[in-house]
């Protein structure tokens, strides 16, 4: 079975020569083979793929010159195979000031290498392991093994003196090494350009980095195809500032006395801006609150903006409209908790609201025996352009937007949706000017019928006239 590849922040040193035939030197002898004891480690499970291994009387290990130190770490099946096994050695330089000491570490799977004076190489016949070394010049060595094999891993530490490629057994120097071994889900938590995720494939659970902004690698550290800082800043500003297109619809809604609708548009503009400021990868990030809260509020505001606009176009009775607003907010919140990224979260409420709109307009057209809205200007200059803009936005969102073109296609989506609201939002409903309040309340058996243009907001309040008197 092939051994996994290792990841480290520095190249491994050249392997020292085999000490089966020790180099000539004063006081060097060839002692007989010994069976060195294996020191166990304590296992502390913190979370999924998060395990720390501790040694007794550690974390520092004293390495006498006459024998190596061997440690055993056991990785459990399924529970440990989906993470990253990390090993870190740090030499205490003050413990070896008098001699030029190099500490070698050999990490092998299932079979420990008998170091002693026989060999320090990390390979023997069909067995191959991972070699590390620390010295006065290179005090820290790190090794990372993604998706390690389960079973027992053995770490053998041995101190030698001299300068490579020739090493000899030390005389009196006892090297002190700080050892840190742990299992983590991802390499360095994927850094600033990635996110560590738990994945499952065919009942196999494992962790991996999802890199962003063009970064790649096990820990999202490969910048060969990474986006520049200027490009990241441009995409963030474009996604955030495109939400300012909601300002004209907010002003228009307030002037038309659609205060509740204006509040929804303001809510959407605010949370969409800060959600995209927090959603960006890399260092161009600004979060005012938890990411999950910002995402939920952004999605809810977007769907509610579509909902309240279409319901307002239906011109329903105030009580019915308020009930639909509240019911829509509750149902949309439930749908977003089930699946925030589902396409039907947008199409479902939109189609349902369009059904209510079509029903209301059909009933009104049948009662009045002519098309509603009755004026061609309303259709030509408002409804048709607004519908085309909104339809284009939905098509871009559903079929064109990808991960690569997200920053500019989604910015266009912001501007199109906000622009369509300005066309589709109906004009203000006119009041009966000049009619006494008592007459409005009782009517004296009659009902005042206001000109159709006045209802559609195509004439000013000064031009309001009574076109007919109808029996109530």
UniProtKB/Swiss-Prot annotation:
What up-regulates or down-regulates this gene? Answer: Isoform 2 is down-regulated in nasopharyngeal carcinoma cells.
What is the name attached to this protein's record? Answer: Transmembrane protein 8B
Q: How is it modified after translation?
A: Isoform 2 is N-glycosylated.
Residue ranges, Extracellular compartment? 1-233, 278-292, 337-342, 401-405
Q: How does it assemble?
A: Isoform 2 (via its cytoplasmic part) interacts with EZR.
Please report the organism this UniProt entry assigns to the protein: Homo sapiens (Human)
Example GO CC term: the record gives: mitochondrion
Give the gene name. TMEM8B
Does the keyword Nucleus feature in the UniProt annotation? yes
Similarity section: Belongs to the TMEM8 family.
């Amino acid at each position: 079975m092939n051994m996994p590849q290792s990841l480290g922040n520095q190249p491994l040193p050249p392997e020292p020569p085999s000490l089966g035939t020790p180099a000539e030197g004063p006081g060097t002898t060839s002692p007989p083979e010994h069976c060195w004891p294996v020191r166990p480690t304590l296992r502390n499970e913190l979370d999924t793929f998060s395990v720390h291994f501790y040694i007794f009387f550690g974390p520092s290990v004293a390495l006498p010159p006459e024998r190596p130190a061997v440690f055993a770490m056991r990785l459990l099946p399924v529970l440990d195979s989906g993470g990253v096994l990390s090993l870190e050695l740090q030499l205490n330089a003050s413990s070896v000031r008098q001699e030029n000491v190099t500490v070698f570490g050999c990490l092998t799977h299932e079979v420990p290498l008998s170091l002693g004076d026989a060999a320090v190489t990390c390979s023997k016949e069909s067995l191959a392991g991972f070699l590390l070394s620390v010295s006065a010049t290179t005090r820290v060595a790190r090794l990372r093994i993604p998706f390690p094999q389960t079973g027992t891993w053995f770490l053998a530490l041995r101190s030698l003196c001299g300068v490579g490629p020739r090493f000899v057994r030390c005389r009196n120097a006892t090297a002190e090494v700080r050892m840190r071994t742990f299992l983590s889900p991802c390499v360095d938590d994927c850094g600033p350009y990635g996110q560590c995720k738990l994945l499952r494939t065919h009942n196999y659970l494992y962790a991996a980095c999802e890199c962003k902004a063009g970064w790649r690698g096990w820990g999202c550290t490969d910048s060969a195809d990474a986006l520049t800082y200027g490009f990241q800043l441009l995409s963030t500003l474009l996604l955030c500032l495109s939400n300012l297109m909601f300002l004209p619809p907010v002003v228009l809604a307030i002037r038309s006395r659609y205060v509740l609708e204006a509040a929804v548009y303001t809510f959407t503009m605010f949370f969409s801006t800060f959600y995209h400021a927090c959603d960006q990868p890399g260092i161009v990030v600004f979060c005012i609150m938890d990411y999950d809260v910002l995402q939920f509020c952004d999605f809810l505001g977007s769907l509610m903006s579509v909902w309240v606009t279409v319901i307002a176009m239906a011109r329903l009775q105030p009580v019915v409209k308020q009930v639909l607003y509240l019911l829509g907010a509750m149902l949309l919140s439930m749908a977003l908790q089930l699946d925030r990224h589902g396409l039907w979260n947008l199409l479902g409420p939109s189609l349902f609201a369009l059904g209510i709109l079509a029903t209301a307009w059909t009933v009104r057209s049948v009662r009045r025996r002519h098309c509603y809205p009755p004026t061609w200007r309303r259709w030509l200059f408002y409804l048709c352009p607004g519908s085309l803009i909104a339809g284009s936005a939905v098509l871009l969102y559903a079929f064109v937007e990808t991960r690569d073109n997200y920053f500019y296609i989604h910015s266009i989506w912001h501007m199109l949706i906000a622009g369509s609201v300005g066309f589709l939002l109906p004009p203000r409903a006119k009041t009966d000017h000049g009619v006494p309040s008592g007459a409005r309340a009782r009517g004296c058996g009659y009902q005042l019928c206001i000109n159709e243009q006045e209802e559609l907001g195509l004439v000013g309040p000064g031009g309001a006239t009574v076109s007919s008197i109808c029996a109530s």
